[in-house]
Amino acid sequence: MSNRIAVVPGTFDPVTRGHMDILTRTSRIFNTLYVLVANNPDKTPLLPMHDRVDLVGQALEEYGFPRSEPKCDSESDRNGPIVKIHRFEKGLLVDCCKQLGATVIVRGLISADAHREASMAYANRNMSGIETVFILPDPPLSVVSSSMVRQLIALGGDISPYVPACVTRFFGTHSG
């Protein structure tokens, strides 16, 4: 089987159960998956990059992904996909994909983002030939967003139903 490499970009500010649903399902399709923790010039992040990267790593461990690349001699010796976290701080997403050898961008899709996501997918394909695949979140998770979680944090609400346990712990000890 050829090595199918995909990227899943996002700000992950913070990582949610919706993100983890998309990552888990994407890992069943691709051999190598890069989780691109990105800076978005249109957003002011709640968390600095190093905290977002660390929380994504902790969440991946919580969901049963190994923290580092498995050691094996051949492709057939490996159990499951390789999942790596990559900081994506500036530049074009398609250039990062080329650098990583990825041929597919995977995005979770909720209806509120559909038009914007489709526009970006067309632009990325026109610039580079890299395809975008959309995965619909599990229905109970389709309303979960980092924006909603940030609002709950600001208002002192319970975020535990919407985020991995590591995020709940982080904000339990880092609340303002």
Curated annotation (Swiss-Prot):
Protein species of origin: Tropheryma whipplei (strain Twist) (Whipple's bacillus)
Cellular component GO terms held in the UniProt record: cytoplasm
Subunit and partners: Homohexamer.
Record keywords: ATP-binding, Coenzyme A biosynthesis, Cytoplasm, Magnesium, Nucleotide-binding, Nucleotidyltransferase, Transferase
Major place of residence: cytoplasm
Single GO MF descriptor: ATP binding
Localization of this protein: Cytoplasm
NCBIfam families for the chain: coaD_prev_kdtB, cyt_tran_rel
Cofactor: Mg(2+)
Binding of substrate, residues: T11, K43, L93, R107
Name of the protein in its database record: Phosphopantetheine adenylyltransferase
